[in-house]
């Protein structure tokens, strides 16, 4: 399995911070956890309470709350879709399928998400989507997920903030709550708290650990 994660490039010009995110094989169009890590570094270095990153995909706002960081992200509408024929045999257990930037398979249980076996070669063939996400309800207060994006060099991501743009609005509606927790069942595990901010945005709360930094 190839390593997960992103490399974040930040520039500071005309009083503004600009950010771009890259994986091994390409540029990421929005990286939530990468933004959290970059924001944590900037907030610490400049002793700020919040920071706005400008990107070609819009503004990303990072703030600190106790020992966590908050990230305001867009809320993406779930659109019903068919399972691409290339991965139809991977989705035989799916109880729902929808698309946003990503293709999302809703599975019947936490165990089904844990046991899901991806195929990188076939996932690369469905390049109309940024990634494949598998998800399931985790009781009445949250959901679990796994995130696969081999098209940009990420076999399985460890912690994916931007995946909540696809998943949180869906689970807000299904579970009847505007505040949920999300667990990413990757090798190292990821944990998020998500809240509905407006009809068009969510707030993601998470901790951040930086592996390397150069400012």
Segments predicted by a language model, with ranges:
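Active-site proximal loop and beta-alpha junction motif in alpha/beta enzyme cores
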Residues: 1-30, 34-215
């Amino acid at each position: 399995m190839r390593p997960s994660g992103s490399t974040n490039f930040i520039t500071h010009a005309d009083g503004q911070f600009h950010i771009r995110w890259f994986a091994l094989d390409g540029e990421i169009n929005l990286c939530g956890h990468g933004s959290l890590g970059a924001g944590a570094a900037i907030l610490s270095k400049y002793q700020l309470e919040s920071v706005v990153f400008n990107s070609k995909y819009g503004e990303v706002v990072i703030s600190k709350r106790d020992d966590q960081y908050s990230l305001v992200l867009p809320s993406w509408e779930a659109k019903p879709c068919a399972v691409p024929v290339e991965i139809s045999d991977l989705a035989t257990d799916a109880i729902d399928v929808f698309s946003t930037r990503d293709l999302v398979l809703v599975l019947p249980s936490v165990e089904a998400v844990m046991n899901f076996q991806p195929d990188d070669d076939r996932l690369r063939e469905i390049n109309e989507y940024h990634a494949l996400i598998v998800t399931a309800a985790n009781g009445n207060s949250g959901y679990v997920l796994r995130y696969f994006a081999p098209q940009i060099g990420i076999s399985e991501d460890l912690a994916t903030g931007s995946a909540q743009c696809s998943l949180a609005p869906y689970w807000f509606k299904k579970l009847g709550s505007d505040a949920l927790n999300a667990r990413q069942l990757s090798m190292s595990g990821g944990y998020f708290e998500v809240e509905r901010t407006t009809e068009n945005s969510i707030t993601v709360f998470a901790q951040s650990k930086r592996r390397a930094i150069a400012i």
